[in-house]
Amino acid sequence: MKKILFTVFLIPLFSNVFGQETKKDTLKPIQMEEVIVIGKKAQITDKQSKTLTSIDDYLQKSAKVDMIKRGAYAWEPIINSMPTERTLVTIDGMRIFGACTDKMDPITSYVEVSNLSEATICSGQEGACFGSTIGGSIDLKRNQNSFGTKKWNFNLNSGFETNNQQKIIGTAINYANKLFYVDTDFMLRDAENYKAGNNQEVLFSQFKKMNFSATSGFKLSKNKLIEASLIYDKATDVGYPALPMDVSIAEAIITSLKYEYTPLNSIVTNWETKVYFNTIMHQMDDTKRPFVPIHMDMPGWSKTYGYYSKMKATLKSHHFLLNLNSFYNKSLAEMTMYPADP
């Protein structure tokens, strides 16, 4: 009887001992030198920069941006389904306010893709770098040349779109040396009425637009530079088929002067200060629309003065950004109603 009990008590003891043992991994570690990913190759047309497309087509590729289309020109960008009153759109950090009471002159219409370096799109408070916002922000950054060896660069672009018989011609002239650079860009668009499916003409969808942009920089020293920029944009005979009115003329002048300082051997990596001024004139009317017993003219003007001073710093693995900005805007709009047959 004693032998039987001794055997019974040993069984759980040995089972516990075997349970504590771990098996050795027989697979040896392998040092990987490269990883090859096999996938579908993108088409070359998707990689190339389409310099003749519109800024509206460029922005609507983002999942955060939707476009309100009232015509073939100057679509209104909506960030995260928020209206423009709750979002912020800037050009190189400059605050610009439209002059149209019906939002027919979005800020994005004053930049051409041929002169666009990148569009920084932020959601919510991430986009509060150049002002308060709820929905987010879009900052359109234009191309900027760099100092280097003396060279000239010439570009000439032309295109034609069959849907609205749009004629496009653009040119760019750039020059740079060790102390000075200048970039110029010109784009002209002339479009007739758009034709939808079954060759159906959409009346009052024509537009004409001219855009000129220039940027010039001068190196004051090894780590200091000064830069001046100008944008002149003029659109005429712009039709909006979704509205009872059209735009006879829209004109904008945007100027700025920037000073940039890059400290040496300091936690401050960059210090940029800019002063800017812009003025916009926008005039809507319905004089070309048929069967309008009471005409209505709606001109608007907007002027903005502002500045910002932005500092970047790095301390070990931490990055800091300090931005001080201010602006003053004066907007004026009028409405005149008169009978078509006084």
Task: Give a label for each model feature.
Residues 48-59, 75-78, 90, 106-111, ...:
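N-terminal periplasmic accessory domains that precede
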Residues 58-95:
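Extracytoplasmic beta-strand/coil segments of soluble accessory domains associated
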Residues 67, 95-124:
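Short acidic/polar hinge/loop motifs at secondary-structure boundaries
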Residues 84, 177-180, 219-223, 262-266, ...:
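Outer-membrane beta-barrel channels and translocator barrels
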Residues 75, 134-136, 152-154, 167-171, ...:
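Hydrophobic, lipid-facing positions within transmembrane beta-strands of outer-membrane proteins
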Residues 21-23, 191-193, 203-207, 223-271, ...:
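Flexible loop and strand-edge segments within Gram-negative outer membrane beta-barrel domains
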